[in-house]
Amino acid sequence: MVTLLFFDCEFTDLSDSASLVSAGFISQSGEQFYAELSDYQEEACNEFVKTTVLPLLSSCPISTVDFVSSLTDWLSKLDGDFLFIADSEWDQKILTKTFAALGKTIPSDWQFQKTPDNFTNGMQRCLFNDEMAAFFLRHPDQKPHHALTDARAIRNAYLRAESGY
């Protein structure tokens, strides 16, 4: 059985030296995991991250070591092989880099997919994009670029696009 996990990462900038700031995950059935990290360098954040992402942080931050441990513990409670779905290749890249910084590799039963590119039907791709925008209109209290909120929006848009609405 494959378990769909929708996720989003926020990170310091769009470069090979980027560090994870926060990550949000939500399963197809609605279980959630969210963490903010404590060991990124704020001065490494680009201006967009400083003005848009950092003001949305509100949880007690944890270390990268605790993040990886907590995430793998949370995932161990879910069934099946995992298909992680994000709306950017950067999310997989930064998650992989975060594990690698601790000398760990992403488990072989974790697969990744970028959406909406995974939809072969152009109508589904359009529906996904429309639903991403509509999510924030329907939930004005939810702000884009908060990792868990974005993961929720991706989940909502993906499931609606997959079902054809």
Tell what function each PLM region has:
Residues 5-92:
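Conserved non-catalytic scaffold segment of RNase H-like nuclease domains
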Residues 88, 94, 131-165:
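Acidic, Mg2+-coordinating catalytic module of metal-dependent nucleases/exonucleases
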Residues 108-132:
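Short, flexible loop segments at boundaries between secondary-structure elements
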Residues 26, 100-104, 163:
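Short, surface-exposed basic-aromatic patches at helix termini and helix-loop junctions that form
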Residues 1-3:
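N-terminal accessory regions of nucleic-acid-interacting proteins
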Residues 90-112:
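Substrate-recognition/cap helix-loop segment adjacent to the acidic, metal-dependent catalytic center
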